[in-house]
Amino acid sequence: MISCPACGQSCTTPPTNTITATEAAQAFVLKEEFPRQNHELMRLITELWRGNTCDIQQCQNCQLKFAWPFVAGSGEFYNLAYPYSDYPKQRWEWDQSIAALPGINLHGGPVLEIGSGFGYFLKKISPSHLPADRVVAIEYNDFSRNRLNESGFAALGEDIRSASFDSYHKQFSAVFMFQVLEHMDDIAGVVSRINHLCRPGASVFIAVPNHLRIDFNESHQSLIDMPPNHISRWTHAAFSHLGARVGWQMMDYRIEPMSWPAFIKQDLVYTHMRRAQRPGSLANVVRGRRRTRLRMILEGLAALSAAPLRIPSWLDAARSTGSLGGSSWVHFKTPSIR
């Protein structure tokens, strides 16, 4: 039986899409550029899925889209698919979370960020809102974790569901998860564990890719939101049902406003990357070259040359009834009495 990870309802409708391991591997690592890594990635994805295909299901109750099998990428997967770590220094959802901090009692206990990268967000709230020694960070990348520790944060390379966090029972006054939840499986176990680790009335801040933007991208020849990297796509209703299952109160929900310059730039890049996945295409030939400055120039020219073909899609974006900004953000409160 296929059950929705957000609301728990059974999903009986046919999948909205089916993706092969070959397609997934090509989306992450071009075989024309890195044939060995592409082959290894395809093998690994097949092992994760226990087969050659993955379905994309949509819950009719809360509209969550999710991969089935609902299996997250492993450390080995991310080492192959994303060998170079790159973290943004600023995100819209950070500002939303920081603006909410004055209404939160951060003196009650430490705070936790899951997926901290280099700690750019944490440096925005510490020491201005709390000292570094009251911040716990989860980060799997060894290099990033070392940088966090050097900044004075307690950085751990452990899953919150591990026994390493047992000592934090009812300790955290706030939890931050930015662009993390969509990568995780066992959602019920994750939120249940957060409840276990949080003080009564703690705040949980979550940001995920905007489902409206992803739907637009996929319906307009842009990048596919590809598993096993992203395995869930969150709507307002999905968040509401998830919160209700664990007694969380939704305090706020927002979608990032769209910036036209950022939208057009990303659209040109993403559609170029999508075309590059097709063997023999101009984008594929260019992107399959060795990484040099010349290749960067050729890629830029190839992406820009397709701009006139993107105008109908941009007009569709202008007519969209929902914001096509990059992120959705939600602020929950955990139960006051447990």
Regions found by a protein language model. Name each.
Residues I2, D252, P257, T271-H331:
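Rossmann-like AdoMet/SAM-dependent catalytic core
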Residues M1-F178, A188-V191, R254-E256, G280, ...:
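Conserved N-terminal segment of class I S-adenosyl-L-methionine
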